[in-house]
Design a protein with these regions (language model features):
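Interdomain hinge/linker elements that couple catalytic modules in large macromolecular machines
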Residues: 1-139
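A cross-kingdom feature that marks ATP-driven nucleic-acid transaction machinery
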Residues: 117, 124-259
Length: 259
């Protein structure tokens, strides 16, 4: 739909549309109808004083969570801000969270737990918000709601611009994983990281029937992709898991240019 409204759109514009709307048709139409067809315009529209998006996250969830909504909102805000392990979240909130995390995952289907590919234990778990819109809403609107209350929307945009590159890098990974699942070309798709977090592989996609596996590095800009480092990380993966050593192995970079 973006080319219809902006024939000169860039990959960054497309990335922004996906990040802010999650591809939800209603949200996409709101952006287009408001004339927000570039990354800058979309950011401004997302946090505008009369923006529908400012209240949407709260309207979606506050009744569902009931009286405990503030605690659930804080957990989701921390996950959206990059605190993705139970230990990290508990150290900030100073409470035991297993019950809340279980409900967010199983009852509300708002978060999912991820473990490194082929890990057999429940250690090294990371949590993610599944809905792209809610992820960005908690990351910026809820977290910095106090800025919106005093009309400091321009200041909030500065905050968003500062962290936008890092934030959308993770969104880009999710985009490519979703596309790979849609392609039905692979029997296994996952990420991998070691216990210390020193070696991390963005995407591993394998076809067990064809005995093929591709290790992917995802970067916003193609110039930042380093396949040499990716191969080194794959060696750590082989040593840690013992998997895919006899497969036909490939290494590939993905960037916004591949969207």
């Amino acid at each position: 739909i973006l080319p219809t409204y902006n024939s000169a759109y860039t990959n960054d514009d497309l990335m922004a549309l996906y990040s802010y709307t999650g591809g939800v048709a209603e949200y996409v139409e709101m952006m287009m109808d408001a004339g927000a067809t570039t990354k800058e315009q979309m950011t401004e529209r997302f946090i505008a004083k009369n923006s529908y998006f400012i209240y949407e996250g709260k309207n979606m969830l506050i009744e569902e969570f009931g009286k405990d909504y503030a605690r659930y909102f804080e957990i989701l805000q921390l996950i959206a801000s990059g605190y993705t392990t139970r230990g990290e979240i508990e150290s900030i909130m100073k409470i035991e969270l297993s019950g809340y995390l279980t409900k967010l995952e199983n009852d509300y289907s708002l978060i999912s737990r991820y473990i490194p590919m082929f890990q057999k234990t429940n250690r090294n778990i990371r949590y993610q918000i599944e809905d792209n819109f809610l992820r960005v809403w908690f990351r910026y609107i809820y977290k910095y709601g106090y800025m919106i209350e005093v009309g400091a929307n321009k200041k909030l945009k500065m905050v968003m611009d500062k962290s936008y590159t890092t934030y959308t890098g993770k969104v880009l990974e999710r985009y490519f994983i979703a596309k790979m699942i849609e392609s039905e070309e692979y029997t296994q798709i996952a990420s991998w990281w070691d216990r210390k977090g020193e070696n991390e592989i963005d995407i591993i996609a394998a076809d067990e029937l064809e005995q093929k596996v591709i290790f992917y590095e995802v970067k916003r800009q193609a110039k930042d992709i380093n396949l040499g480092i990716l191969k080194d990380k794959a060696e750590h993966f082989f040593q840690a898991t013992g998997k895919f050593k006899k497969f036909d192995i490939g290494y590939q970079g993905l960037s916004m240019e591949d969207m």
